[in-house]
């Protein structure tokens, strides 16, 4: 596998529609940066959030997750309660090529504040808005700003395509359009 450069990302975004909307440079200056970087793409977080609350639960069970566990918030920012988490989605829509796997890592500016961003790999031929898990590990509320950088996407190209892609197996998160809670 080879990590792909800004040149490759730019061509794939423009010709294949791999990232929409695509920002061809790093946007910075008083904000958490986003856009094209040397070997990746810094995606933004949209203004839709689902913040976890324990009002309806005494146990978090991925096999029996109660969607009432989330409070929907839409705005320029989201304050995540102490020791809690939120789900959000990317501003960008991604179309991953068949021979590419993406690894997504939280931005250091956010991590250095005790806010951890988790996204599972974007698999070959997965399409959709990325659901982003954001954990506040601090004892204070933590603010996330909509339409600013949240995580960097690294593109790894394989020397051969997989036998079965995410699209082939009709993955349960294929073509997601909003913030998507856990599914079985």
From Swiss-Prot:
Keywords: Hydrolase, Nucleotide metabolism, Nucleotide-binding
InterPro entries: dCTP_deaminase, dUTPase-like_sf, dUTPase_trimeric
Pfam families for this protein: DCD
EC number: 3.5.4.13
Active-site annotation: 133 (proton donor/acceptor)
GO molecular function: dCTP deaminase activity; nucleotide binding
Top-rank taxon: Bacteria
Biological pathway: Pyrimidine metabolism; dUMP biosynthesis; dUMP from dCTP (dUTP route): step 1/2
Gene3D superfamilies according to UniProt: 2.70.40.10
Positions that bind dCTP: 107-112, 152, 166, 176
Catalysis: reaction(s): dCTP + H2O + H(+) = dUTP + NH4(+)
Residues making up the signal peptide according to the UniProt record: none
Biological process, per Gene Ontology: dUMP biosynthetic process; dUTP biosynthetic process; nucleobase-containing small molecule interconversion
PANTHER family noted in UniProt: DCTP DEAMINASE
Subunit text: Homotrimer.
NCBIfam families noted in UniProt: dCTP_deam
Function of the protein: Catalyzes the deamination of dCTP to dUTP.
Family statement drawn from the similarity comment of this UniProt entry: Belongs to the dCTP deaminase family.
Protein name in the entry: dCTP deaminase
């Amino acid at each position: 596998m080879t990590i792909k450069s800004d040149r490759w990302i730019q061509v794939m975004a423009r010709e294949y529609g791999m990232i929409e909307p695509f920002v061809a440079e790093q946007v910075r200056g008083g904000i958490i940066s986003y856009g094209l970087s040397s070997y990746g793409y810094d995606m933004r977080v949209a203004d839709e959030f689902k913040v976890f609350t324990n009002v309806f639960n005494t146990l978090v069970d991925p096999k029996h997750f109660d969607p009432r566990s989330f409070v929907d918030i839409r705005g320029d920012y989201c304050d995540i309660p102490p020791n809690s988490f939120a789900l959000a989605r990317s501003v960008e829509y991604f179309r991953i090529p068949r021979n590419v796997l993406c690894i997504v890592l939280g931005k250091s500016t956010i991590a250095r504040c005790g806010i951890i961003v988790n996204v599972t790999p974007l698999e070959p031929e997965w399409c959709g808005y990325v659901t982003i898990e954001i954990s506040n590990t601090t004892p204070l509320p933590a603010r996330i700003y909509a339409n600013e950088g949240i995580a960097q996407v690294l593109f790894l190209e394989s020397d051969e395509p997989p036998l079965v892609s995410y699209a082939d197996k009709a993955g349960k998160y294929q073509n997601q359009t909003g913030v998507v809670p856990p599914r079985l």
